Amino acid sequence: AISLLMCLILSALCASSESAVVHGDDFAAERAVKSSPYLVLSPADEMVGMSTANEAFDKSPSYYDDDDDDFVNNEKRRLRFHKRRIRFHKRPQEVSGLKPVMMSRASASADENSLFDLYNTDGAMYQRELRAPRLRFYSLRKRAAGDEDKAEEHNPETESHSRRKRSALTPSIRSLRSSLESGIAKISINQDLKAIADMLIVEQKQEREKYLADLRQRLLNKGKRSSEVALAASDKGDEERELLNTLSNLLE
């Protein structure tokens, strides 16, 4: 009996929950759980749809309000945005001085291979030549110059658009070559200066040795002559003998 009573109570609760309907202005459609099986009504008690189909969120009163002020504000905002886009599309023509190209709807839609639609949803025409990315083009004379900078890795047309751009930390081959040549030139200059200095030192040493040899020879000649004179004249004084002894000692 107790189990039968419990089954009846559960069946009554399930029936009441399935037939329950939410009313009132205090109910917020945004707060409803998407998996809820209840029917969601608008504040005006108009049927919107099942929340399981996400229609209550798409057609909530906050987005579809029947108030005239909100509708006028939304319309003004849409028109302002539309005028801004039209002015943005007309700006490149006024700056560049190009005449507006008039294209019919049929001719614009006839290009099936086009990657972009020529007309947007607001009616502004998409102009491919004005919206294309700006590329730097150079004359054929500069391209065919044959210089090292015009190689494939140094092509000025593709250098700015390449993924691997050369930075200041990775210099080019030409700059490395120039720096290496300048370094070699500095080394050679330093070697030349060192050789010149060594040569001057050797020359000075040779001149000094030659001067000392000449001085020694003159002193020897003078000593010999003085010794011969001393032997010839034996009556010289003691001072001259001491002088001769000192000279002989110096020569030795």
Swiss-Prot record:
Tissue: Bag cell neurons.
Subcellular location: Secreted
Domain of life of the organism encoding this protein: Eukaryota
GO cellular component: extracellular region
GO biological process: neuropeptide signaling pathway
Pfam families (UniProt xref): ELH (PF02323)
One MF annotation (Gene Ontology) recorded for this entry: hormone activity
InterPro entries, sorted: ELH (IPR003424)
Spans traversing the lipid bilayer: none
Region described as Disordered: spans on this chain: 145-171
Propeptide cleavage-removed residue intervals: 20-75, 92-130, 144-185
Major location category of this protein: secreted
Keywords, sorted A to Z: Amidation, Cleavage on pair of basic residues, Hormone, Neuropeptide, Secreted, Signal
Basic and acidic residues bias spans: 145-161
Modified residues (Lysine amide): K222
Signal peptide range in chain numbering: 1-19
Role this protein plays: ELH acts as a neurotransmitter locally, upon neurons of the abdominal ganglion and as a hormone by diffusing into the circulating hemolymph and modulating the activity of other organs. It specifically causes contraction of smooth muscle in the ovotestis and expulsion of the egg string. Alpha-BCP decreases the activity of a cluster of neurons in the left upper quadrant of the abdominal ganglion.
The family this protein is said to belong to: Belongs to the molluscan ELH family.
Name of this protein: ELH type 2
Organism field: Aplysia parvula
Gene: ELH2
